[in-house]
Amino acid sequence: MSDSHEAESTTRDFSSFNSTSREFAELTDAEVFNSHLCGKIATTSKLNLDSVRDLSIAYTPGVARVCEAIHEDPSLVHDYTWTGRNVAIISDGTAVLGLGDIGPQAALHVMEGKAQLFQRFVGLNGVPIVLDTTNVDELFDTICHIAPSFGAINLEDISAPRCFELERRLIDHINIPVMHDDQHGTAIVTTA
């Protein structure tokens, strides 16, 4: 499926929701917890791996050709790896909407939900990452080290004022877009 077809599909799919309804469905605890068992997202392969030929294309020796091409021209990384459609959703769990400072483990489920929204409505792969630190330097260093695996960084539910310093430092240091969801997302929704 082409990128433009995916974008049209996600827009069309979004319109199937009743936008006039402001009510949530009534849910039982069993229904909620059973649906969330083992998490809400999964990573799947875009390629078939049904034969030796498939394996040769997806991994060795075929992968070496792509690696060499990217090594010669690093701009190809977004065309031939998942980085072009991949967003890191990063939180320390210190400012989760409606829940406050619940820590990284409890916040992970919210980040999984954000990943679902990115996939369903924008066609992007969101990767939830929760970090067990509130130290801005540690957050910054960790995000800088993992940034080459992603096409963008989405900062989520990190308490102020640390979130503003972290965002500013990342924008100045890494070469991919950085979105501070609690700041930019609110501004986008407010102006929409």
Place the predicted regions along the sequence by residue.
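N-terminal ligand-binding/catalytic initiation module
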Residues: 2-174
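A glycine-rich, Thr/Ser-enriched phosphate-binding loop motif common to dinucleotide/cofactor-binding enzymes
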Residues: 179-192
